């Protein structure tokens, strides 16, 4: 029921967004974008975190290949797409009362929300996998899970850095450095906490 409700929210938000683009309506576009943002917030805070805390991991579905993950990815991707398409139809600054919203700024914000959301979504699926019987079959599931987190975060940061340089955008590069720093700190403090200090220092220097 929770995932079904999420898809209903997504269809409604996408309908508002599509209508705003077709009508070249600034205010309807802002409402559609807000609806997408609220839907993404519901998915991140309630559908995943709250349900995980209350009922445990939903291991009856395959990691990555499930409707909950798909809903999250779709709603996250819809936000920057909505801003980009509406910016083409309404290229000037959008009026919200006395305030002006620049499409370029909104595009960057939507892109960063989407990127962080994807990072979170895959991390959540890693948690789902290691809570399942298959994940528990590892010799040390806890260590394997944290290693998987670190690998995914490092891959994500590398991709964001590449996007930042290829497209000459500062925001992806900044996000990449933040994620890299967090990954290095996690590797040093969590993944290698049982390793002797001298090897932790050497590994940290090499990773840096």
What are these regions, as identified by a protein language model?
Residues 1-208:
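Alpha-helical transmembrane segments of multi-pass membrane proteins
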């Amino acid at each position: 029921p929770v995932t079904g409700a999420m898809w209903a929210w997504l269809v409604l938000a996408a309908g508002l967004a599509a209508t705003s683009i077709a009508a070249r309506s600034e205010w309807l576009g802002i409402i559609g974008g807000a609806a997408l943002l609220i839907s993404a917030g519901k998915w991140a805070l309630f559908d995943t975190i709250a349900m995980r805390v209350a009922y445990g991991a939903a291991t009856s579905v395959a990691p990555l290949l499930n409707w909950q993950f798909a809903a999250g990815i779709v709603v996250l991707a819809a936000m920057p797409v909505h801003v980009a398409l509406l910016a083409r139809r309404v290229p000037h600054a959008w009026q919200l009362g006395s305030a002006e919203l620049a499409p370029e700024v909104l595009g960057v914000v939507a892109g960063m929300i989407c990127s962080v959301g994807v990072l979170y979504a895959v991390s959540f699926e890693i948690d789902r996998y290691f809570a399942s019987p298959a994940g528990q079959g590892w010799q040390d599931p806890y260590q394997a899970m944290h290693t998987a987190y670190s690998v995914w975060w490092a891959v994500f940061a590398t991709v964001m850095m590449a996007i930042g340089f290829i497209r000459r955008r500062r925001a992806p590069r900044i996000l990449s450095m933040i994620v890299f720093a967090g990954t290095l700190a996690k590797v040093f403090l969590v993944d290698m906490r049982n390793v002797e200090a001298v090897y932790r220092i050497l590994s940290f220097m090499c990773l840096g």
